[in-house]
Amino acid sequence: MAEAVGAVTLIAAPARRRWLWSALAAMLGLLTARISALEVHTPKEIFVVNGTQGKLTCTFDSPNTTGWLTTVSWSFQPEGTDSAVSFFHYSQGQVYIGDYPPFKDRVTWAGDLDKKDASINIENIQAVHNGTYICDVKNPPDIVVRPGQIRLHVVEIDNLLVFLVWVVVGTVTAVVLGLTLLISLVLVVLYRRKHSKRDYTGCSTSERLSPVKQAPRKCPSDTEGLVKSPPSAGSHQGPVIYAQLDHSGGHHSGKINKSESVVYADIRKD
């Protein structure tokens, strides 16, 4: 009998050693594996009506496939406190709920690790559930994680309706003001363009293309007297003699002489 027990012990010893070596190799592989960052995504805040169900949405991104080693933990930090209490844990397909009274028989799993979803539902939310919820996911070798945080506000139905009305009114007002401003700017631009075209009177095409020739003007000399004949034979006015006045300022000036015709003598017949 003793020999049989000794044989069983000798047979079990190698098997135990192999199991230990396998476990050590697995742990060593986890320690030496590449550690990559896992990103957790949650909404910043949600509003839930008192007495209804609230869903705490939590998703994550990981380059590694989820499996039995993937875990999800939820913690709660009540308003006015600095410490968080863990009240939910999910691992290997099992849900573990703590004894924290505000969440007893209220929390259910609503996620799917294959879809990288770690969400939960809370039934019959009350004012005591106001606070910050923390979603922490581990997916080895992704263990460097910044947990996601959700600020939950429990509101009464009347307050929620008032809040929604103000949101709608504010949105509609902003849209109306924006459209009014845009239409006003368009009308101002069109008005300015229309009046700028009306005020500008340019020459026609024919005027721009047709050259205008002016007859050369004869400038009398300084010593030349011009005699203008009377306009008609029946007039009693005699010939008018014009003289040129030189305004050049000197006979040797290099400037162009400017002359002016004045009446020198008016001979009339009585």
Curated annotation (Swiss-Prot):
Disulfide bonds join 58-135. The modification Phosphotyrosine is found at residues 242, 264. Glycans are attached at residues 50, 130. The modification Phosphoserine is found at residues 204, 206, 210, 221, 261. It is found in: Membrane. A motif (ITIM motif 1) lies at residues 240-245. The keyword Signal applies. Residues 184-270 are cytoplasmic. Residues 201-257 are annotated as: Disordered. This is Myelin protein zero-like protein 1. It comes from Rattus norvegicus. The lineage of its organism: Eukaryota, Metazoa, Chordata, Craniata, Vertebrata. The gene is Mpzl1.
